[in-house]
Amino acid sequence: MFDFMTLEKVREKGPLVHNITNIVVANDSANGLLAIGASPIMASAKEEMDELAKMADVLVINIGTLDGELVEAMKIAGRAANVAGTPVVLDPVGVGATSYRRKVVQELLAEIQFTAIRGNAGELAAIAGEAWEAKGVDAGVGSADVLSIAEKVANEWSTVVIISGEVDVISDGTRFAKVANGSALLPRITGSGCLLSAVCGSFIAVQDDAFRASVEACASYAVASEYAELELERKLPGSFRPLFLDALASWSVEKTHAKAKIQESGEHK
């Protein structure tokens, strides 16, 4: 099922990815999107959200650094994107960390139909209402079954769920996939998950099947990180970051096919 041709479609079409994102990761996300062949726009003024919804091929909402004006812009953009038929991706950064973040995400979910939600296990557990010990914006620890969390959120919100971790879990509520790739250095650079959300958005923009797009995005991204690590003389995050950007720019279908470890199933048992 997964031929990774979505990657080639991203390069051919250069989708316009509208990011309402946080101040920590904006630069890295923009450069990462450029590396894979997408076209990023990092805009958050509420006055231009309606126009951008008609221009963009996908909207990616990231709640990493919130304020009231930004939340209002997110809501306007999300509603306008829904009207325009533009897919919308949510990255609920640290949703379990504070009551304000939980409130904002609840409001966004109530007002916007999201095509996909990508986060770590702690973030998706918070959305699912499952017990989990969050550690700020990091995944933290919990005993809930990650596949069950993905299934619950996907079905409740009619969306594709991407739970990032040592093994990524992707589900649309009826289909499930695990991606067992990725460099151990990815969690050591800030914004690697946020960039993955944007990359998933760019794949979804050019592929009608959001589940397939998300699986291929996760696998391609993780495999690129493994190739980047192979180029390192010393396994340090500062050296890894630019090599990872180069690996994203030199992605190929053949490279991804050669290393991707995907396990797919039709149902969660």
Swiss-Prot record:
One Gene Ontology molecular-function label: magnesium ion binding
Positions annotated to bind substrate: 42, 191
Record-listed E.C. numbers: 2.7.1.50
Keyword Nucleotide-binding appears in the UniProt entry: yes
First-level EC class: transferase
UniProt key word Transcription regulation: no
Gene Ontology BP, a term: thiamine biosynthetic process
A Pfam family matched in the record: HK
InterPro entries, A to Z: Hyethyz_kinase, Ribokinase-like
Pathway assigned to this chain's UniProt record: Cofactor biosynthesis; thiamine diphosphate biosynthesis; 4-methyl-5-(2-phosphoethyl)-thiazole from 5-(2-hydroxyethyl)-4-methylthiazole: step 1/1
Sorted UniProt keywords: ATP-binding, Kinase, Magnesium, Metal-binding, Nucleotide-binding, Thiamine biosynthesis, Transferase
Cofactor needs: Mg(2+)
Catalytic activity line of the entry: 5-(2-hydroxyethyl)-4-methylthiazole + ATP = 4-methyl-5-(2-phosphooxyethyl)-thiazole + ADP + H(+)
Positions bound to ATP: 118, 164
Its job: Catalyzes the phosphorylation of the hydroxyl group of 4-methyl-5-beta-hydroxyethylthiazole (THZ).
NCBIfam families hit by this protein: PRK09355.1 (NF006830), thiM (TIGR00694)
Similarity remark: Belongs to the Thz kinase family.
Protein's UniProt name: Hydroxyethylthiazole kinase
Organism in which the protein naturally occurs: Listeria monocytogenes serotype 4a (strain HCC23)
